[in-house]
Structure formats: C-alpha cells, structure tokens
Amino acid sequence: MARIAGVNIPTNKRVLIALQYIHGIGQKNAAEILEKVKIADDKRVNQLSDQEVLQIREVIDRDYMVEGDLRRETGMNIKRLMDLGCYRGLRHRRGLPVRGQRTHTNARTRKGPAKSIAGKKK
C-alpha cells in the first residue's frame, strides 16, 4: 500500500482513482498529476515503481494543497468570516445555510434534527 501525502492509497485500484482518496485531489487534479509525471491513467497502484510513487509525491507536495493544510486553510477562512461579522460569517456562526437557501422548511442537514414544539397537537 503506497503512502502519499499521509494517506494510504489502495493498491488494487487504478492510479487515477486511488489519488482521489487524498483530500483536495479530485478527478481533474489526479489526471493533471499523472500527465505531469507521464504515467498512464489505466495503470494500477501495485504496478507503480518506487520511483514513480516518489515522483507523484513530489508533484503533490510542490503544486497542490492537500489534507491537513487544506482543511486548516478552509477552517481559517470560515473563522475569518465569523470574526469579521459579515453575513456569511453570521450564518456560519448560527449553523444556518450560507448560500441563500430557504430555511422556513428544509435545511435540516445544516440545522440538525427537528426540535418538537410543545402544544402543537391537533
């Protein structure tokens, strides 16, 4: 099992798919990485040489923000919005949808389970 960017990527999958197990690398970025390193995207992880794994690791470390660094930056961006007190920051602080969705009904994922109200029986 190859370890890239602190993540054990599965050995029996294609490299294009396996790279997507790393937080911050999707389909497009995985294809870009393989193109830079000149590895066929239909090759499996267990067929990679140690040199190829090392090249992939170097490209990711040099050109992409992944895993902990990406999570930290995302968290810092949200914290910055909350500290500014702007509308988006207030929505984050209150645990409500940030991007203009309705909240009269729905928004249960963001708001959590429905709270029952006493005296609403018919």
From Swiss-Prot:
Top-level taxon of origin: Bacteria
Matches recorded under PROSITE patterns: RIBOSOMAL_S13_1, RIBOSOMAL_S13_2
Keyword line: Ribonucleoprotein, Ribosomal protein, RNA-binding, rRNA-binding, tRNA-binding
Stretch list, region Disordered: 95-122
Entry GO terms, CC: cytosol; small ribosomal subunit
Keyword Amino-acid biosynthesis: no
InterPro entries noted in UniProt: Rbsml_uS13_C, Ribosomal_uS13, Ribosomal_uS13-like_H2TH, Ribosomal_uS13_bac-type, Ribosomal_uS13_CS
Pfam families, sorted: Ribosomal_S13 (PF00416)
GO biological process: translation
One Gene Ontology molecular-function label: rRNA binding
Function per UniProt: Located at the top of the head of the 30S subunit, it contacts several helices of the 16S rRNA. In the 70S ribosome it contacts the 23S rRNA (bridge B1a) and protein L5 of the 50S subunit (bridge B1b), connecting the 2 subunits; these bridges are implicated in subunit movement. Contacts the tRNAs in the A and P-sites.
Quaternary structure and partners: Part of the 30S ribosomal subunit. Forms a loose heterodimer with protein S19. Forms two bridges to the 50S subunit in the 70S ribosome.
Record family assignment: Belongs to the universal ribosomal protein uS13 family.
NCBIfam families, alphabetized: uS13_bact
Xref: PANTHER family: 30S RIBOSOMAL PROTEIN S13/40S RIBOSOMAL PROTEIN S18, SMALL RIBOSOMAL SUBUNIT PROTEIN US13M
This protein's name: Small ribosomal subunit protein uS13
